Curated annotation (Swiss-Prot):
Assembly with partners or alone: Interacts with VP3 (Potential). Interacts with VP2; this interaction activates VP1. Interacts with NSP5; this interaction is probably necessary for the formation of functional virus factories. Interacts with NSP2; this interaction is weak.
EC number: 2.7.7.48
Top-level class of the enzyme under EC nomenclature: transferase
Function comment: RNA-directed RNA polymerase that is involved in both transcription and genome replication. Together with VP3 capping enzyme, forms an enzyme complex positioned near the channels situated at each of the five-fold vertices of the core. Following infection, the outermost layer of the virus is lost, leaving a double-layered particle (DLP) made up of the core and VP6 shell. VP1 then catalyzes the transcription of fully conservative plus-strand genomic RNAs that are extruded through the DLP's channels into the cytoplasm where they function as mRNAs for translation of viral proteins.
Family recorded in the similarity comment: Belongs to the reoviridae RNA-directed RNA polymerase family.
Primary location: virion
An example Gene Ontology molecular-function term: nucleotide binding
Protein name as catalogued: RNA-directed RNA polymerase
Originating species: Rotavirus A (strain RVA/Human/United States/P/1974/G3P1A[8]) (RV-A)
Pfam name, any one: Rotavirus_VP1
Necessary cofactors: Mg(2+)
Gene Ontology terms: cellular component: virion component
Subcellular location: Virion
Record lineage: Viruses, Riboviria, Orthornavirae, Duplornaviricota, Resentoviricetes
Amino acid sequence: MGKYNLVLSEYLSFVYNSQSAVQIPIYYSSNSELEKRCIEFHAKCVDSSKKGLSLKPLFEEYKDVIDNATLLSILSYSYDKYNAVERKLVNYAKGKPLEADLTANELDYENNKITSELFQSAEEYTDSLMDPAILTSLSSNLNAVMFWLERHSNDVADANKIYKRRLDLFTIVASTVNKYGVPRHNEKYRYEYEVMKDKPYYLVTWANSSIEMLMSVFSHEDYLIAKELIILSYSNRSTLAKLVSSPMSILVALIDINGTFITNEELELEFSDKYVKAIVPDQIFDELQEMIDNMRKVGLVDIPKMIQEWLVDCSLEKFTLMSKIYSWSFHVGFRKQKMIDAALDQLKTEYTEDVDGEMYNEYTMLIRDEIVKMLEVPVKHDDHLLRDSELAGLLSMSSASNGESRQLKFGRKTIFSTKKNMHVMDDIAHGRYTPGVIPPVNVDRPIPLGRRDVPGRRTRIIFILPYEYFIAQHAVVEKMLLYAKHTREYAEFYSQSNQLLSYGDVTRFLSSNSMVLYTDVSQWDSSQHNTQPFRKGIIMGLDMLSNMTNDPKVAQTLNLYKQTQINLMDSYVQIPDGNVIKKIQYGAVASGEKQTKAANSIANLALIKMVLSRIANKYSFITKIIRVDGDDNYAVLQFNTDVTKQMVQDVSNDVRYIYSRMNAKVKALVSTVGIEIAKRYIAGGKIFFRAGINLLNNEKRGQSTQWDQAAILYSNYIVNKLRGFETDREFILTKIIQMTSVAITGSLRLFPSERVLTTNSTFKVFDSEDFIIEYGTTDDEVYIQRAFMSLSSQKSGIADEIASSQTFKNYVNKLSDQLLVSKNVIVSKGIAVTEKAKLNSYAPVYLEKRRAQISALLTMLQKPVSFKSNKITINDILRDIKPFFVTSEANLSIQYRKFMPTLPDNVQYVIQCIGSRTYQIEDSGSKSSISKLISKYSVYKPSIEELYKVISLREQEIQLYLVSLGVPPVDAGTYVGSRIYSQDKYKILESYVYNLLSINYGCYQLFDFNSPDLEKLIRIPFKGKIPAVTFILHLYAKLEIINYAIKNGAWISLFCNYPKSEMIKLWKKMWNITALRSPYTSANFFQD
């Protein structure tokens, strides 16, 4: 057992270093004799520590425990109160504290003034502009850094250089924080007025960002970038990130392509040795120079110098530094503005009469036609989803806020809640539920707002619309997305696509006679000019569609959708400004509708099509691809002559002119070799991703606990690492130690061990080896997993009370009755479970469950209860398989070139040997025939877990299940009687196992699991026809081999002689695998 436990025990002696502090390790074992010794050992330790005796003799006496049992947790006593941080910090505060430039930002409150200057009193004060929104404190972060520095103060050679660099940067942070004193957080990890009033307002969030940056410093270049960003972000809280990352949009156009990967007809990436020269007009260089000058104006020195030096020969090798700067710039933290400024930002756009009406008209028509094209087929066929749109909307209703808090009665319990699902239930119970009436959002009922904060951009506002808007839009949007799924233009939704294929799409058509036009249209999406043509285009499309149907239900669905658009054309928003709530007419499109993503994509596609049709009047070219991806669109144009500087410049200016005729403030660029969009950038024929996920500051507070956030922190660290921004792993482990500790009393804390946090259980937080997901198969691992399973499902009294109320029951019955043709307990129970799960987002329920779980965990971490479970986990299956595998050394040579330069070496090596995966492995069961059959007749979407349960039932029961969901008895009978059904059994099992093994997350999503190179390392003699068993054996072998290769940079081959007698046993077991949900899996899901 590795590094974590070592770091843990050292950390504890670092933090609790007084005379009175004691650490008692707690061990456990699955061996009952040894377990008795573990219990004795613990009892004696507690006894000795009460008497104030040393524990050393006990460690000698119980050496067998320490050597053979597994560490479960460490119990830590400490009586001294926590001012330890301040005491230690003084030793590092040897430098000159930073002084904020109080004129650095346009908006007064974005300057880092002393809090009492920004907010005169506690009543006025809000922490919303600087709230780190993470369940860990500045003092913990400081402790973690000082712990690292102390541990490494004696490092030698290169390690010592890293130490010195970090020490130097920490001196800046320590001196500045020490000058004002470390702000104390309250129990919710927030910083109150009393604490902050005599300190700079942004001190905490700045210090968090700075710590995150300095703990990511390795090389001298990292040090220079970090130092500059740390110092300048203390004053500049508004534009720094934007200034530093702006040049990238031009840099990608400067590197020649010399060999690249392209997407071929089979949708695979294949290498192409083409050479494409970067053709760059002088005008572009002038723009770049201007960006660099702007950087210098705000005091940046080293970063612009690095860019300037790179520009001398624009080499791909040195481009990693550019991509590093681009990633680092995001780590200065979120830009959080006041809501009033975020809202007024869009409204400041001045209207000009001088716009090209004809262009607006063409834009509107293109939107109209696209809407019609998307929905034509389902409307003409009276699709059941469009007929039962209300039910579909209710089934997928979220538990997000509905915009206002209401008093609701559930049985005898009265609660206050803002949640949509609860409002729906309450309205239905009181006859107020009228989905046929879309409430207006005009001056009488202005829209409450949410916010979205992002580094390097201004705050954006989000509409929190009444639930009627969701119900009205849901079904139609689902149909739109279904169309987008098989339309390549929609890069974000296209089914076979992923980021790698989109990359190959662009490089495929780049050549000496083509250019690529890429535009960031985020400004346009939220501009006032877009509103009327956008909504009108949608309304006109819906009107045309209404004439294509005779079904009143479909017509009603389209009509309600149209009503949402009409209402939103006259929208008012309510913005808290100080103590008053202002009502403002808001004439722009904002996020918050169900249609946001789909409709924006449609509009952006219409926009670029219109631009291309305009420049086609002047140039002769073929449009090879048009793509839209979120806020960005791009197109590759092929001319009949080689591209020259003059052509690039002309096309560029013409495109910009066209946009300006529409008053669209967008950033349009033309290049011959690369593009830069929000999600990815292509330079020198290689693909890059921005590693900009903040670790120690979060965008907003949700209802996740410290454990969840520890898992999210780790998951963010992994994503950044795959994208080329690495934070010291030891620091991340220290943060996990801090965030997963559980306080028992003021002076007693329990720290879980590595085994607890990495075992695949409901408490899993991280992997003991980055990028490798291990499924423990030893006795102790399975034992602890069983123990945790016994306490995983926690009850909540509040939830039970709500669920047993008439209001809740009536709602679930209403849904069941509308959905089912005949009663079916599986579906009804499924709905009830889903609805009850939605109650989790109601804080009191969540807290209650969590409290129960923590207290159970506390008991468990002090003495695990052995527990005979009939549940089977994926670990049990792998444990059965493992003994039959024999390992031998093997050899695979590197045969693929690199196309993602930012990957860590070990991951890069595996990809270069076995190739990369350009598709998502289907892990939802949606490709199975039964799933398709259900969606043909019903709006109900069973989860992979439900399909897995259903498909293993008796044939009679499957038939009843299908019939109850509205599948005609004939079809249901045919299905069960055919071979398709047995194929489905296999397909669904396969999907389920892939889902359990997180094959589409982390770095596994990059590897080609069907690589012939991988297959040839596996030898499994074929015995009998049980495809499911063959599948699991092969998958296990592949994971073993890949994990070994990631860890050791070498290959093994596996031989498996699985006895035929065992196969049937294994097959039966495979139908009872329980899925485990943990903070770790939800963090993975959260990345999605």
